[in-house]
Amino acid sequence: MLAKGYTATSVDEICTAAGLTKGSFFHYFEGKEHLGRLVAERFYATRKQLFALAPFHQKKDPLERVLGRVDFFIEMSRGPHPPKGCLLGTFVQELYATHPAIRSVCADCFADSARGFQQDLEEAKATHAPRARWSAQSLSEHLTAILQGALILAKAKQDPKVIRESLGHFRDYLRSLFRE
């Protein structure tokens, strides 16, 4: 589904790739949309587990955790297999108007992802920029927007460097917010 998109991937292709009969597919899933919801949830759960192991969580200073989170995403784009995209972002772009149940699952995953960053931002703000007027909630969603946009642009340009550059700009922006 990540390679071709939800709409272009047929149940027959899913069954062939999984080595299942159509009968087996429909025994376990109500239909393709049910599978789509479960795939989105599984994709996010897998990413969340990977993310939970990131070293920045060990940092005592919340500002270092904030910057470390961005650095973690930058490093992920340098790996031997840079991200080819985000299934959640792909699903939302393709299905937001036609499959509200899948869109809702993706929105919940994005919100959950932003919550951890928001908490670190709130702690960093209280410690390092108590008079700042920016919203930790809005800024945490801004990271999602930048990351999703960078993934799309990296695909369009076929160059993961775009991800590093976009996140590097965001990191610089964050540092400037804490210097005000």
Task: Please describe what each predicted stretch is.
Residues M76, E123, T144-K161, Y173-E180:
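Amphipathic C-terminal alpha-helical segment
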Residues A3-T7, Q58, K84, T127:
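Short coil/turn segments at alpha/beta junctions that flank glycine-rich nucleotide-binding fingerprints
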Residues R65, P80-A101:
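Amphipathic alpha-helical segments used for helix-helix packing
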Residues T98-I102, A111-L139, S176-E180:
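Hydrophobic alpha-helical bundle segments that form small-molecule/ligand-binding pockets
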